[in-house]
Regions:
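Aromatic, loop-rich ligand-recognition surfaces of beta-strand-rich domains
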Residues: 370-439, 449-497, 502-504, 514-517, ...
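Extracellular low-complexity, O-glycosylation-prone stalks/linkers
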Residues: 515-541, 559
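Beta-strand-rich modules
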Residues: 547-568
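Predominantly extracellular/luminal regions of secreted and cell-surface proteins
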Residues: 168-180, 335-371
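Short beta-strand elements bearing conserved aromatic residues within extracellular beta-rich modules
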Residues: 170, 424-426, 522-524
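Beta-rich carbohydrate-recognition and catalytic domains
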Residues: 22-208, 220-267, 282, 290-335, ...
């Protein structure tokens, strides 16, 4: 009897353990896979679309809370990876807008973000319940607020979202309803696009329209105050976050030589601005930001996160290198180094042959392998007869998948929509005849519009097949089906003919190199010192880059590397470009 009992117990443990292994993940991939809200402040457009932007992420009593523009609530996590949505007892009817959040000594959590711009500071000691109360005062003319209480219990508010006005700040009286302590605020940060190339407006910084400064956030580190801000516009690939550094909360502040400190202009998911910086597991900082999608509407957006560091000289930088490929998750503390947490899994599906059960001519199935967040495939019908098959062209080791769903001509989804889910089966094959299941979501009840799936063990495959079962709404529309792993061929050889020509307008540089055979793309890296190449731009389908994000009078150092599905070439360095 005892032997039988022990055997059954062992089998149960083995079964539970296998389930745990199957769903445990040690990596993540941008865009973040959240159950984004359908905002309705633009319902007059007649389009339903998901969006998430301007994340304010704070730690509170060892857990994390994320407040996001127009979301009708907020998210909670124990590990910065797995987020569950909280519908609070009390909240803004229209959803908060560009919110601020601050943890005051683990006693109360403060938040503000009234869309009207006139607001009380809200507080609670139970954010899971969401019984928010209002401080009995109203602060006016606050766009994109940021709230900060220093170690000495002095409180400050920062704000700004304008192409006319600067980021401003003022001290509040923590003992008297957080009323302002001075009649006039301090003007703290102005954009200088004539000097700082990255602050110029437009896609790739090519517009002469006056840029926007917005989204402040304050981080105190080693006694210094890092006042962060976003520019030049949320609807562009070059939306990023810069930083000024000072010795006191209201400055004076000095422009950091390495700027923008968080910047993701190339690749699949572009944009990384209007964010927040939070200390996560193991004391490692994470910067959350905003990705631009801007198809249904210019403010259609997604969220991203990057490990963020302060180097030995106090330079703040986010690791956006391969920033939309799998990276180690925040709980993998020992693998988060100053060189970043890129997992090393390459993109196997880029530009590979693909076929489908059906397609609209205007949205062909080739869009699911083009590595462009703005394009998507639409099937003729939304039924369980639809499928997609990708030929990786060689047998490879598949480690992870990302499936991106899209809202196409939807008109009936508003706010927090119940029972949203995506149901499907993903299979793999070596020969296109015999198939094995990689991921079975046919009975899923989870809303996962950017579902990232890390396999419990690598799968040998040449063909990947998506078999559709159900999505809500009128249409089946999918962006990229991204397959990550390692090919079994050769890495690219090192780049040759690498040149950087700084323009007479020092904000610009023309970077070029000779094409490398068998390459998917290239990473161009640059920085203000040979050991500070903290910025990078992923380039597909070209062997040149017009870089327009440099600072007048600042020396820069550059490097380039090639990559494909098999790995990354040796990096080629250029000592200096004046």
């Amino acid at each position: 009897m005892n032997k039988k009992f022990c055997c059954i117990a062992w089998l149960l443990l083995a079964f539970v353990g296998s389930l745990h292994a199957q769903y445990r993940t040690t990596t993540y991939c941008n865009p973040l896979n959240l159950d984004y809200t359908y905002p309705f402040h633009n319902s007059h457009l007649g389009k339903s679309y998901r969006s998430g932007a301007d994340p304010a992420v704070v730690e509170f009593r060892g857990e994390y809370y994320m407040f996001v523009t127009r979301s009708w609530g907020y998210w909670h996590s124990k590990d910065l990876m797995n987020w569950d949505f909280i519908t609070p007892e009390k909240w803004y009817f229209e959803g908060c807008n560009a919110p601020a959040a601050h943890n005051y000594k683990d006693s109360v959590l403060y938040v503000c973000g009234n869309p009207s711009g006139a607001m009380s500071i809200l507080y609670t000691d139970n954010p899971k319940r969401g019984d928010w109360k209002a401080v009995p005062s109203v602060l006016t003319d606050l766009q994109d607020p940021a709230f900060f209480i220093d170690d000495d219990d002095r409180a400050y508010m920062y704000w700004g979202s304008s192409n006319r006005w600067p980021i401003r700040g003022k001290e509040l009286d923590i003992k008297d309803k957080f009323l302002p302590m001075a009649k006039k605020p301090d003007s703290l940060l102005y954009l200088r696009p004539d000097i700082h190339g990255w602050e110029r407006f437009g896609e790739n910084h090519t517009s002469d329209i006056k840029p926007f400064i917005e989204g402040p956030w304050m981080t105190k580190h080693n006694g210094m105050y890092y006042l962060q801000y976003a520019a030049p516009g949320t609807q562009f690939n070059v939306y990023g976050d810069g930083v000024y550094v000072g010795k006191s909360p209201l400055g004076p502040f000095e422009y950091a030589a390495h700027n923008p400190f968080c910047y993701k202009p190339g690749g699949f998911a572009t944009g990384a601005g209007h964010g927040s910086t939070v200390r996560g597991p193991g004391g490692i900082y994470w910067h959350f930001g905003t990705i631009h999608l801007s198809i249904n509407f210019k403010f259609e957006r997604r969220l991203c996160m990057f490990p963020t560091f302060f180097d030995k000289d106090g330079v703040m930088y986010s690791d956006t290198y391969f920033g939309d490929y799998p990276h180690y998750s925040p709980d993998q503390v020992t693998r988060q180094t100053v060189d970043g947490g890129f997992r090393g899994w390459m993109l196997l599906s880029y530009a590979k042959p693909v076929k489908a059960s059906s397609q609209l001519e205007s949205h062909p199935v080739t869009n699911v392998t083009d590595e462009n967040l703005k394009t998507f495939w639409v099937a003729e019908k939304n039924d369980d007869k639809q499928w997609v098959e990708i030929d990786l062209e060689q047998v490879s080791d598949v480690y992870a998948l990302q499936l991106n769903f899209f809202d196409y001509e939807e008109t009936e989804f508003w706010g927090r929509v119940p029972d949203l889910r995506q149901c499907y089966l993903v299979e793999a094959s070596v020969d296109g005849v015999h198939w094995q299941v990689l991921a079975d979501y046919r009975n899923s009840f989870r809303d996962a519009p950017h579902n990232y799936i890390e396999l419990d063990r690598p799968a040998e495959a040449r063909y990947i097949r998506y078999r559709h079962h159900y999505v809500p709404g009128k249409n089946l529309a999918m962006g990229d089906i991204r397959v990550f792993g390692l090919g079994r061929g050769k890495k690219p050889t090192a780049v040759k003919g690498f040149t950087v020509a700084r323009d007479t307008d020092e904000r610009n540089a023309r970077i070029s190199w000779q094409p490398v055979k068998g390459t998917q793309g290239y990473n161009v890296l640059w920085g203000v010192a040979p050991d500070k190449l903290y910025s990078s731009w992923m380039v597909y389908g070209d062997n040149s880059l017009d870089l327009r994000s440099l600072t007048v009078g600042q020396k820069y150092y550059f490097a380039v590397e090639a990559f494909n599905e098999n790995g990354i070439s040796q990096r080629v360095f250029l000592k200096e470009a004046r």
